Structures are given as structure tokens and as C-alpha cells.
Design a protein with these regions (language model features):
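Short, acidic/hydrophobic/Gly-rich beta-strand patch recurrent on exposed beta strands
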Residues: 63-66, 130-132, 286
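Short, low-complexity Ser/Thr-rich regulatory SLiMs
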Residues: 52-56, 120-122, 187, 388, ...
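Short, solvent-exposed loop/turn elements at beta->coil junctions and helix N-caps
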Residues: 33-40, 106, 114-119, 385-389
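Carbohydrate-binding surface patches
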Residues: 118-121, 126-137
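Rossmann-like S-adenosyl-L-methionine
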Residues: 136-143, 147-427
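Extended interfacial segments that mediate partner engagement and assembly in macromolecular machines
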Residues: 1-105, 123
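Internal alpha/beta scaffold segment
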Residues: 72-114, 134-156, 175-184
Length: 427
């Protein structure tokens, strides 16, 4: 399918779901904006995860799982990922042969190397290589891996060629110098399908890489959530910023804030931004990223939004000293997972009664469900903006602006007038 056809399909998908699930008609209940596509629909992913295994002949294979299975389809170069990934995979494969590092077998729970995670900073060109292992590497293997990374960075051969069967040409970098700023071993001892463990050991460079969304810098560790298409994420967030219509005085709540990507992006135009996220590590990252950028008008909380927000406003019913009445937020931003907003969170939004809601969605079906609820409880859907962040896939992001009605549906009073009993002739 051509990229133009993909964009047309995705915009229709959003419109159809809003109609079918939400009962919302394009051009009647809301304004549909033309989808924002990519300049280049390839090589846009800054993150790739490759399972590692062995084929029936004992050869090392790396690639992707076949649909709904754990059978690995060998693939060194996916056209959606960075072109340096294949160079790194080839080098790691040779290193495994050189140091006799076995792939992990999830059926018998034997072996060492489970996955290879590669992250790339598109604005900084920094690369992170993270090996997910069942146990910590032997010292000689770890030291050998560091030498491989140093050689990749220098543009020379990546192999130590210590075993008699090594083929130095298979791991030659062809003179291309990489910028691997972080080499991490993530240890996952659990016999589960969860990819990453909790323990990280940095073998080379920093425990993180850096990248930007707009002019906001982020530190990204193996465990960090970060948008996989940062260039198009900037397009998405600029649209969210436009819909928020901030003047510099508003109180903004970001109710699925993650590591603070949207919160920090909006903070430069807001009076105060509050982020809420249930994952403690994400909030730590958000606070660190705020400090990294010198942003002091953002505050982050761990917990469920409906609980955090209620407690916050009970403790701060008075003016906060800035001259802004903080008992009522001006804008709420939500960027939920594919399952959409929790029912209690939607209740919280209505109770908080913001002037505007900016809903960032990665699933137009659950978006339609949630918009139906909000439209029935005092909010008008103003604009719907599809954004393609994942070319050559079926996924589409959507940004929606909702505005509070001056009078909520439940506030209307029905009055019945019997004209037959009235004299309506002029005096």
C-alpha cells in the first residue's frame, strides 16, 4: 500500500470508529483535521528489541517473533529501524561465537543472552546497546564485549577472533564509526516472557543516552519509556500545545504523564504543570528530566490520578501564592495506554471541570468510547487531529480538543408550557 493510501486509510479508521463506537459524526459533532503524515515513512524507530535464540542446527539467530508465537524470524535489518542496528547485531553475534555465549532457551530455561535492546538518539546520534541476560556475563566475555563496542566506535573490525571458527569479515564495520555512548547489561533472572529485569549494570559509557523532543532534553535508560518516533512526536506534541491554547498562567494536569514528555513540553507555556503516573520509576525520570532542563514549574506525583488529584485539591483549596486560583485546573491532558482512560479517571476529569481537555490517543476505538462519555457529561468535541507516528503499520495517533460547555446537559431544566390555556393575543 502506498504511503498516501495508508494515510487515507488511517484517517477513515479514526472517523469510522468515532461514528460506530462513539456515535459521533464527522462534520456535525466535531471538525476532522487532515492527518499529519511523515516526511519519510522509513527508518523512524529509535528503539528495537531483538530476541536471541538458536535454530534447529544450533546457529545463533536474532530477529522478531512471528505473530502470536515465540518463534524467531531471523532479521538483522528492519527498514523501520536505524540502519546501524544490523551492524551491532552482526558484531554481537560474532562476539557470542568468540566467547561461547549461549542464547537463552525459554523452553528449558538454559543459556545466557535473551534479548538485544538498541536505542538511538535521533537528535544526538547517541546509541545504547543493552544485552538482556539470564545472569551476569563472565568477566572475560564482558571485557570482550567492551572491546567490541570500542572497535565499533572507531570503525574497525568488531571481532576479537579468538576462536578458531571465527570469520573476521562477518563483523567488519566497513569503516563506519558508530557513537555508542552506553553499553548496559540488564539481568532478568525470571522464567517469564517479560523482556527486561530490574537490575542494570553499565559496562561502558553512561547508564543512559540523551535525546530531544523539541528543545526539551531527556535522559533515556534501558527501562525508560520514550516515544519511539521522536521527530513525529514533536509534531504530535506541538498539536497538543496548540489545542491547549496556553498563555503562561494556566494550571495544567497531565494525567498519564510517563517520564514527563508532554508535561515538560507544555511547561514552557503554562503557569504550572502537574503530572501523575502510577509507575514510580517513570516519575523519578520525570523529576530528573525537569531538573535537567531547569524547569521549576512542573510537579510530579506517583499514584492513581483520581486519588492523587482529589488529595491535592483538598490540601490546596486556598490560593497558592502565585495569584492563580489553583482550586480549578484550566487544562487537562491525558495520554492513556491503548485500553483508554479508566472510568474513575473520566469521573475525575468531569469533577475537576477544566475549560479544555486535550486527549492524546493511540487507539481510536477506546478514544471513541471515552469521547462519548465526556460529550455526554458537559464537553464538546471541537477538533480531531490524526497523526501518523507509525508508518507501514495499522496504528495511528489522534489528538482531540474538547471544550467545556457553558451549561452541562444535566444542568438544563425542562419546562412544559401549555399554550392552550394562555392568552397570547397582543394587548
Amino acid at each position: 500500500m502506498s504511503y498516501a493510501a495508508q494515510l487515507k486509510y488511517k484517517q477513515k479508521l479514526v472517523s469510522d470508529n468515532l461514528q460506530r463506537i462513539g456515535g459521533l459524526t464527522e462534520g456535525v459533532d466535531y471538525e476532522m483535521c487532515d492527518i499529519l503524515g511523515m516526511d519519510t515513512p522509513f527508518r523512524y524507530r529509535n528503539k528495537a528489541q531483538y530476541p536471541v535464540g538458536e535454530d534447529k542446527d544450533g546457529n545463533i539467530i536474532m530477529g522478531f517473533y512471528a505473530g502470536h508465537t515465540h518463534s524467531i524470524i531471523p532479521c538483522d535489518d528492519c527498514l523501520l529501524g536505524d540502519e546501524n542496528n544490523s551492524v551491532i547485531l552482526t558484531a554481537v553475534r560474532q562476539w557470542m561465537k568468540d566467547y561461547r555465549v549461549r542464547a537463552y532457551n525459554e523452553n528449558i530455561h538454559k543459556g545466557t543472552l535473551r534479548h538485544i535492546l538498541i536505542r538511538t538518539g535521533f537528535h544526538t546520534d547517541e546509541i545504547m546497546v543493552c544485552l538482556v541476560t539470564k545472569k551476569m556475563l563472565r568477566k572475560e566475555a564482558a571485557d570482550g564485549l567492551v572491546r567490541v563496542i570500542e572497535r565499533l566506535n572507531s570503525g574497525s573490525s568488531a571481532s576479537d577472533n579468538i576462536s578458531s571458527g571465527s570469520d573476521n569479515n562477518t563483523s567488519n564495520n566497513s569503516g563506519r564509526k558508530l557513537n555508542i555512548a552506553s553499553l548496559v547489561v540488564n539481568i532478568n533472572k525470571e522464567d517469564t516472557n517479560v523482556i527486561l529485569g530490574r537490575e542494570c549494570v553499565t559496562l561502558y559509557g553512561r547508564p543512559y543516552i540523551e535525546d530531544y523532543i523539541g528543545d526539551i532534553k531527556f535522559q533515556i535508560s534501558p527501562l525508560s519509556f520514550f516515544q519511539v518516533n521522536p521527530k513525529q512526536t514533536e509534531v504530535l506534541y506541538n498539536k497538543a500545545l496548540e489545542f491547549a491554547n496556553l498563555t503562561g498562567n494556566e494550571a495544567v494536569w497531565d494525567l498519564y504523564c510517563g517520564i514527563g514528555t508532554i508535561s515538560l513540553f507544555l511547561a514552557k507555556n503554562a503557569g504550572m504543570v502537574y503530572g501523575v503516573e502510577i509507575v514510580p520509576q517513570a516519575i523519578e525520570d520525570a523529576k530528573n528530566n525537569a531538573g535537567l532542563n531547569g524547569i521549576d514549574n512542573a510537579e510530579f506525583f506517583v499514584g492513581k490520578a483520581e486519588e492523587v488529584v482529589t488529595a491535592f485539591y483538598e490540601s490546596r483549596k486556598a490560593d497558592d501564592g502565585t495569584g492563580h486560583n489553583m482550586t480549578r485546573p484550566d487544562v487537562i491532558v491525558v495520554d492513556p495506554p491503548r485500553k483508554g482512560c479508566d472510568e474513575k479517571l473520566l469521573d475525575t476529569i468531569v469533577t475537576m471541570s477544566p475549560q479544555r481537555v486535550v486527549y492524546v490517543s493511540c487507539d481510536s476505538a477506546t478514544l471513541a468510547r471515552d469521547l462519548k462519555v465526556l460529550s455526554e457529561r458537559g464537553y464538546k468535541i471541537v477538533k480531531v487531529q490524526p497523526v501518523d507516528q507509525f508508518a507501514n503499520t495499522v496504528h495511528v495517533e489522534t489528538v482531540v480538543l474538547l471544550s467545556q460547555l457553558k451549561q452541562k446537559p444535566d444542568d438544563y431544566i425542562n419546562v412544559t408550557i401549555e399554550f392552550d390555556d394562555m392568552d397570547i393575543t397582543s394587548a
